């Protein structure tokens, strides 16, 4: 086993994943990546002949992003599911091969999977070497890994957008090109360019997802979300998938069940077409890494959509369900989006026995809401009432050091605005920061993919002030954990955004020389202490 794609490991995981991933599953995910490389070599050419291959490529595009997504941290731990992805990748590759496309074949184009799990794992060990030790140049290898992890993040956003009918062929074209290129030679400049192109494509993937979400559910509006609960049967939904939540809300309507969000589903309360459901009540719990404790205490059924799942405890294993690409061995998977088993389980369970009043948090400050008061914001900046903007967001995690983000937000001066997004917000989402002339000082922009919204807000402000983004009174204080964060970081680099503070630790897959390039060219810096960083930013 050799896995270093997430923030939890300072050195590669070699015996067992810090995330709970077993070595066999890790090797199968490596083998799936290898099989996808072979598929990509043919798909890259087939996509150019879209008039002849439209139907088959529609299936392959959908499959490829799902399969890549399944290899992202905390998504799919089910070896049987990964095995099926491997077989399907080879089947689709051979389907394209039979269509006669001329390609420069690599070893992965000829790969034949074993017919049993044990032998597949052995093949996965070989694939691991080919993927993660393919270059003797550690800097090239580092950039290859940044590209691969970015592809996994891009695939996640593309999958969500695709489900809601938003696609762009150039996203798939890049995925195939990059997967194919990983098997071939390329120097440092080639891979630096590939990383920046990944950022460009991820921006497009996030734009598609933004269009998908707002097109179907409306633009988020400022909405108070209760952190308490209602007496009655209950289902909590975690993950990121708005369509799954919508389907569950439709299927639970009139059944006497309250639906709650968990983790990154919190921003869903701001979407008009979701908040209209009267039984869609409030938010339960905090970020993904606390789910074992929080789910054990939840008196209803649990639905995991996409990531982030961690090993279910026995106390709730019989009442947690997965859907989409997420999976865990022994946990019931809802493949067809008929959530009857979830609903039946919720009706069996006691639910909450009494109402509980608690504080509320505000969501819904995506680009449309913020830009609707842009004139007021600009006036306040010009009048000196808003001195600085901070974007404090990204992934949360269990590793020590993340209290920095809580402390940073708490210490921001009263004439500053904090925008936040993704699950990193749970370090401070319920803090009372007050407001500036009616504008809340803490603005929740949304999920991690809503980095697109934050970028649009920054671009609009830079246009209004007639300066570049880097000249705005804006600082980015980011926390990372998994591959979607890597993809977002490459997008920020592609846009030329500088002086990003990144933590709680720097990625293990970034070599010293690559880090030097990022520091010298983009001013990326590790976080220090909240006090030091605030002093440096505001001096």
From Swiss-Prot:
<feature type="binding site">
    <location>
        <position position="3"/>
    </location>
    <ligand>
        <name>[4Fe-4S] cluster</name>
    </ligand>
</feature>
<keyword id="KW-0963">Cytoplasm</keyword>
<keyword id="KW-0411">Iron-sulfur</keyword>
<feature type="binding site">
    <location>
        <position position="264"/>
    </location>
    <ligand>
        <name>hybrid [4Fe-2O-2S] cluster</name>
    </ligand>
</feature>
<comment type="function">
    <text>Catalyzes the reduction of hydroxylamine to form NH(3) and H(2)O.</text>
</comment>
<keyword id="KW-0560">Oxidoreductase</keyword>
<feature type="binding site">
    <location>
        <position position="13"/>
    </location>
    <ligand>
        <name>[4Fe-4S] cluster</name>
    </ligand>
</feature>
<dbReference type="GO" id="GO:0051539">
    <property type="term" value="F:4 iron, 4 sulfur cluster binding"/>
</dbReference>
<dbReference type="InterPro" id="IPR004137">
    <property type="entry name" value="HCP/CODH"/>
</dbReference>
<feature type="binding site">
    <location>
        <position position="484"/>
    </location>
    <ligand>
        <name>hybrid [4Fe-2O-2S] cluster</name>
    </ligand>
</feature>
<keyword id="KW-0004">4Fe-4S</keyword>
<feature type="binding site">
    <location>
        <position position="240"/>
    </location>
    <ligand>
        <name>hybrid [4Fe-2O-2S] cluster</name>
    </ligand>
</feature>
<keyword id="KW-0408">Iron</keyword>
<dbReference type="GO" id="GO:0004601">
    <property type="term" value="F:peroxidase activity"/>
</dbReference>
<dbReference type="Pfam" id="PF03063">
    <property type="entry name" value="Prismane"/>
</dbReference>
<dbReference type="GO" id="GO:0046210">
    <property type="term" value="P:nitric oxide catabolic process"/>
</dbReference>
<dbReference type="GO" id="GO:0050418">
    <property type="term" value="F:hydroxylamine reductase activity"/>
</dbReference>
<feature type="binding site">
    <location>
        <position position="6"/>
    </location>
    <ligand>
        <name>[4Fe-4S] cluster</name>
    </ligand>
</feature>
<dbReference type="InterPro" id="IPR011254">
    <property type="entry name" value="Prismane-like_sf"/>
</dbReference>
<keyword id="KW-0479">Metal-binding</keyword>
<feature type="binding site">
    <location>
        <position position="308"/>
    </location>
    <ligand>
        <name>hybrid [4Fe-2O-2S] cluster</name>
    </ligand>
</feature>
<dbReference type="InterPro" id="IPR010048">
    <property type="entry name" value="Hydroxylam_reduct"/>
</dbReference>
<dbReference type="InterPro" id="IPR016100">
    <property type="entry name" value="Prismane_a-bundle"/>
</dbReference>
<dbReference type="GO" id="GO:0005737">
    <property type="term" value="C:cytoplasm"/>
</dbReference>
<comment type="similarity">
    <text>Belongs to the HCP family.</text>
</comment>
<feature type="binding site">
    <location>
        <position position="482"/>
    </location>
    <ligand>
        <name>hybrid [4Fe-2O-2S] cluster</name>
    </ligand>
</feature>
<feature type="binding site">
    <location>
        <position position="448"/>
    </location>
    <ligand>
        <name>hybrid [4Fe-2O-2S] cluster</name>
    </ligand>
</feature>
<feature type="binding site">
    <location>
        <position position="423"/>
    </location>
    <ligand>
        <name>hybrid [4Fe-2O-2S] cluster</name>
    </ligand>
</feature>
<feature type="binding site" description="via persulfide group">
    <location>
        <position position="395"/>
    </location>
    <ligand>
        <name>hybrid [4Fe-2O-2S] cluster</name>
    </ligand>
</feature>
<feature type="modified residue" description="Cysteine persulfide">
    <location>
        <position position="395"/>
    </location>
</feature>
<dbReference type="GO" id="GO:0046872">
    <property type="term" value="F:metal ion binding"/>
</dbReference>
<feature type="binding site">
    <location>
        <position position="19"/>
    </location>
    <ligand>
        <name>[4Fe-4S] cluster</name>
    </ligand>
</feature>
<dbReference type="GO" id="GO:0042542">
    <property type="term" value="P:response to hydrogen peroxide"/>
</dbReference>
<protein>
    <recommendedName>
        <fullName>Hydroxylamine reductase</fullName>
        <ecNumber>1.7.99.1</ecNumber>
    </recommendedName>
</protein>
<dbReference type="InterPro" id="IPR016099">
    <property type="entry name" value="Prismane-like_a/b-sand"/>
</dbReference>
């Amino acid at each position: 086993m050799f896995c270093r794609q997430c923030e939890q490991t300072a050195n590669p995981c070699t015996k067992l994943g810090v995330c709970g991933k077993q070595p066999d599953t890790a090797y199968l995910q490596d083998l799936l990546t290898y099989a996808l490389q072979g598929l990509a070599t043919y798909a890259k050419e087939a996509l150019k002949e879209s008039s002849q291959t439209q139907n088959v490529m529609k299936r392959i595009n959908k499959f490829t992003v799902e399969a890549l997504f399944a290899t992202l941290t905390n998504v799919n731990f089910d070896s049987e599911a990964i095995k099926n992805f491997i077989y399907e990748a080879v089947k689709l590759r051979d389907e394209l091969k039979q269509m006669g496309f001329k390609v420069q074949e690599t070893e992965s184009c000829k790969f034949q999977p074993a017919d049993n799990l044990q032998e597949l794992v052995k093949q996965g060990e070989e694939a691991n070497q080919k993927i993660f030790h393919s270059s003797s140049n550690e800097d090239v290898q580092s950039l290859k890994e940044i590209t691969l992890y970015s592809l996994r993040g891009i695939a996640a956003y593309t999958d969500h957008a695709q489900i809601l009918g938003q696609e762009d062929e150039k996203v798939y074209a890049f995925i195939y090109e990059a997967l194919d290129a990983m098997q071939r030679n390329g120097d440092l400049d080639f891979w630096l360019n590939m990383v920046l192109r990944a950022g460009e494509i991820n921006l497009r993937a996030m734009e598609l997802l933004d269009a998908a979400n707002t097109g179907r559910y409306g633009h988020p509006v400022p909405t108070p979300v209760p952190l308490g609960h209602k007496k009655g049967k209950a289902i909590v939904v975690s993950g990121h998938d708005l369509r799954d939540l919508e389907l569950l809300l439709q299927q639970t309507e009139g059944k006497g069940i309250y639906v709650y969000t968990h983790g990154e589903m919190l921003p869903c309360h701001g979407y008009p077409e979701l908040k209209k459901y009267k039984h869609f009540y409030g938010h339960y719990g905090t970020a993904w890494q606390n789910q074992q404790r929080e789910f054990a205490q939840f008196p209803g059924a649990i639905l995991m959509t996409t990531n982030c799942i961690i090993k279910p405890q026995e106390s709730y294993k019989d009442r947690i369900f997965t859907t989409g690409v997420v999976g865990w061995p022994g946990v019931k998977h809802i493949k067809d989006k008929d959530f009857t088993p979830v609903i039946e389980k919720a009706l069996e369970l006691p639910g909450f026995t009494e109402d509980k009043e608690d504080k509320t948090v505000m969501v819904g400050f995506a680009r449309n809401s913020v830009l609707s008061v842009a004139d007021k914001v600009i006036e306040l900046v010009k009048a000196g009432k808003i001195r600085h903007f901070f974007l404090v967001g990204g992934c949360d995690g269990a590793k020590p050091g993340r209290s920095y983000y809580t402390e940073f937000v708490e210490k921001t001066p009263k004439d500053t605005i904090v925008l936040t997004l993704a699950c990193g917000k749970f370090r401070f989402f319920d803090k009372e920061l007050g407001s500036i002339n009616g504008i809340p000082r803490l603005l929740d922009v949304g999920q991690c993919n809503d980095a697109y919204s934050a970028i649009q807000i920054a671009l609009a402000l830079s246009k209004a002030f007639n300066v570049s983004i880097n000249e705005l009174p804006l600082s980015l204080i980011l926390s990372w954990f998994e591959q979607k964060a890597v993809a977002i970081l490459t997008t920020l680099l592609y846009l030329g955004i500088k002086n990003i503070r990144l933590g709680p630790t720097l990625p293990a897959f970034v070599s010293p020389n690559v880090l030097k390039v990022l520091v010298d060219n983009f001013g990326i810096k590790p976080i220090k202490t909240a006090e030091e960083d605030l002093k440096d930013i505001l001096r």
